[in-house]
Amino acid sequence: MKIQLHKNGWTSIITDIDLRSASQQEMNTIAWLAAKDTVVVIRNQHLLPGDEVDVCEKIGACEQVMPPDTPTQGTKLVEGGRGKIVRVGGGNHHGGVAGVFEHVSDMDWHSNRTGTETRDPLIWLYGVKDSQGSRTSWINNILSYQDLDQELKEQIKDLNLPN
């Protein structure tokens, strides 16, 4: 496994790894990089949905969206994802049900349930098909906060996001 820091200074690029056979130590390193650098990019993987769940579970608990034996027809669930993977965007509408976040236009902004105190700290995105030309952008709020001047930090220090 080779690790390179992107020119932005906070994205790790990992090459020379097959996630299906990655050791627990390698997965722990990937998890540590995600916590440290916010975004980890690993390209050229050929994972089936069950492989994705296995890889993610080496990092930590995966959200159980629906019971593992739930039929995927007519849902946003991905076949073989054991009730833990949802389709994002369009494409194959299982029983007329589109994936989450299917939009004709760009989604300007969203985040991982910021109003939920116990939200899962990691989001896994895996482009399977029809992702050519799409773009996902990330912001590092830790660096954004660190870049604020001390006066503004003092003004906002007691702000809380209501649930």
Each predicted region: which residue ranges?
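Non-heme Fe(II) oxygenase catalytic core, chiefly the N-lobe of the double-stranded beta-helix
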Residues: K2-N163
